[in-house]
């Protein structure tokens, strides 16, 4: 993430309606047109002197100088007609996304002025509609109309404009009460207070006070090699079902009927629900006929797990874990995935289990290892009979448990998985196999066992990384030798910038790192971006030991291990 540069930053503010621009008529608030005219009267949101001097159009405003060398100029585009956010549907959100697409090259960022009641839904939907964002899209609004004496609208709009104009945050965000949230992590938590929104399972991306604090490690990186893609084909036939104690199976059966194609089911605690056989049977029957069910906790914080038997039963019924997604994000994601053409049911389920736009935090291997859960879960799996329920449960849980066993170097558990007849090439949401994990951790005995079982030695995860590359980065010499002996090799993509990496290692006198790359088959004479090789860098730095090592390895190039 970087600061926006240039003397002028041009933004498009899309005014869709909402409380921020409403006026009182007959004792009730109604949508108010002409927001740009109202904003022109507010000095904190418009510098009239600058606008006159530069002959800006009536619908184009400019903020007072936020810094001595930069101005934020914004055009207000008012929707025709304005919408009450309670009436917003996918159709209106598609219109917003397409408006952003039409003006994408003209502006450095976008602010969407939206009603608060469905703003979290809108932010979630837009995050999935807008793929490969390279510019900020920030939603904001108000609890009190902007022309009222005591209104939060002025600060919210100003904050959204400043964040969109001063920082390159390539995400759909929501700005409210001095906090910038990832849009698909938000939910509305208060009907009246100005602090109306929260992000229960992810800290704010930025907090505004006397200073602006950016949580840079949380901001997603832009995909500069790809162009903006707007997904307007969203599936409208999705629903939200909240379980409650004693919910009748007949009610659930009625809800799950066609034309419904997907449902977000809010469950108790960490993903639990009633285990009554008739209810589980209705859920299983719906899943078997192709209805996709995503399990989200109705708790504000926390995530869906399978630590308890009721949660296990839900997984066994064919229900997909939503982990820590909000219901708003899960509903939007379901609509997006079901709207993608040409995908099989299995492909759609795999997409739902992946983190696509930063909407959920997937469990790490360490999470699976915590509290001795690995052994308990493996024992539970081994004790299950060969019923359809058991097979479904194993399909859900085995990938994560196999990776956890590889992480822990647990040969016994991995052998138990083999005895279950399971393929150890199975992958998690990020494309990692047990071999990736074992290679990264340096567990040579686990790597040897996996190779003996015939796993794919060159399997790549979603980042294009092979087990060999992970072993090189970890300087695990014994693992590198095992992988090379099994025929592993670094791909052209993995070797693309190897010259720069080798020069970096040489400058730091990192002999082990250089030896690892050589052991993996890399050419130590590869130049970096300016034509220097590792040996030249080591000589220039006066690293005699590194020079001697590199010369020795070059002399032994003919003896370098070759793939079989």
UniProtKB/Swiss-Prot annotation:
One GO molecular-function entry: lysophospholipase activity
Positions of modified residues (Phosphoserine): 478
Tissue: Expressed at high levels in liver and kidney and at a low level in stomach. Barely detectable in lung, heart, spleen and brain.
Enzyme class: hydrolase
Residue segments, region Asparaginase: 41-350
Pfam families noted in UniProt: Ank_2 (PF12796), Asparaginase (PF00710), Asparaginase_C (PF17763)
Binding residues for substrate: 84-86, 116-117
Activity-pH dependence: Optimum pH is 6.
Listed EC numbers: 3.1.1.5, 3.5.1.1, 3.1.1.47
The entry's keywords: Acyltransferase, ANK repeat, Hydrolase, Lipid degradation, Lipid metabolism, Phosphoprotein, Repeat, Transferase
Family per record: In the N-terminal section; belongs to the asparaginase 1 family.
Subunit and partners: Monomer.
Database matches in NCBIfam families: asnASE_I
UniProt name for this protein: 60 kDa lysophospholipase
Source organism per UniProt: Rattus norvegicus (Rat)
Lineage: Eukaryota, Metazoa, Chordata, Craniata, Vertebrata
């Amino acid at each position: 993430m970087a600061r926006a540069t240039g003397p002028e930053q041009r933004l498009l503010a899309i005014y869709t309606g909402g409380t921020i621009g409403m006026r009182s008529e007959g004792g009730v608030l109604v949508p108010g047109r002409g927001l740009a005219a109202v904003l022109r009267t507010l000095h904190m949101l418009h510098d009239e002197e600058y606008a006159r001097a530069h002959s800006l159009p009536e619908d184009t405003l400019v903020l007072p100088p936020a810094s001595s060398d930069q101005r934020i100029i914004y055009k207000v585009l008012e929707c025709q007609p304005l919408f009450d956010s309670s009436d917003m549907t996918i159709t209106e959100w598609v219109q917003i996304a397409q408006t952003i697409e039409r003006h994408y090259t003209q502006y450095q960022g976008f602010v969407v002025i939206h009603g608060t009641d469905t703003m979290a839904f809108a932010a979630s939907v837009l995050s999935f509609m807008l793929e490969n964002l390279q510019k900020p899209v920030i939603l904001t609004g108000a609890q009190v109309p902007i022309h009222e004496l005591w209104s939060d609208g002025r600060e919210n709009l100003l904050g959204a404009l400043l964040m969109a104009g001063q920082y390159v945050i390539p995400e759909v965000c929501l700005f409210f009460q001095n906090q910038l949230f990832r849009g698909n992590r938000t939910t509305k938590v208060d009907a009246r207070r100005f602090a109306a929104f929260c992000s229960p399972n992810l800290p704010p991306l930025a907090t505004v006070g006397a200073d602006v604090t950016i949580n840079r490690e949380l901001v997603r990186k832009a995909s500069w090699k790809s162009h903006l893609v707007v997904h307007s084909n969203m599936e409208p036939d999705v629903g939200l079902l909240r379980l409650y104690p004693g919910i009748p199976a007949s009610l659930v059966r009625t809800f799950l009927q066609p034309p419904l194609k997907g449902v977000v089911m809010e469950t108790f605690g960490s993903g639990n629900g009633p285990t009554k056989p008739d209810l589980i049977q209705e859920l299983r029957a719906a899943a078997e006929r192709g209805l996709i069910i995503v399990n989200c906790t109705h708790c504000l914080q926390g995530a869906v797990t399978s630590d308890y038997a009721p949660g296990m039963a839900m997984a066994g019924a064919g229900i997909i874990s939503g982990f820590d997604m909000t219901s708003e994000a899960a509903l939007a994601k379901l609509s997006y995935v079901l709207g993608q053409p040409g995908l099989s049911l299995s492909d759609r389920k795999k997409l739902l289990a992946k983190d696509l736009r930063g909407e959920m935090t997937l469990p790490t291997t360490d999470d699976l290892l915590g509290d001795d859960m690995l052994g308990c879960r493996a024992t539970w799996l081994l004790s299950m009979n060969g019923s359809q329920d058991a097979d479904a449960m194993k399909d859900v849980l085995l990938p994560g448990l196999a990776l956890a066993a590889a992480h822990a170097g647990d040969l016994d558990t991995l052998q138990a998985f083999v005895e279950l007849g399971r393929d150890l090439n199975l992958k998690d949401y990020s494309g990692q196999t047990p071999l990736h994990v074992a290679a990264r951790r340096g567990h040579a005995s686990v790597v040897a066992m996996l190779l003996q079982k015939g796993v794919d030695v060159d399997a790549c995860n979603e980042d294009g990384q092979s087990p060999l590359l992970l072993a090189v980065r970890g300087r695990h010499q014994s693992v590198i030798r095992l992988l090379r002996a099994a025929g592993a090799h670094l791909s052209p993509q993995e070797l693309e910038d190897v010259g720069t990496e080798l020069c970096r290692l040489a400058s730091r006198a990192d002999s082990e790192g250089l030896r690892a790359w050589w052991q993996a088959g890399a050419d130590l004479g590869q130049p970096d971006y300016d034509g220097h090789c590792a040996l030249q860098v080591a000589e220039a730095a006066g690293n005699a030991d590194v020079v001697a090592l590199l010369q020795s390895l070059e002399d032994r190039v003919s003896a370098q291990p070759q793939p079989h």
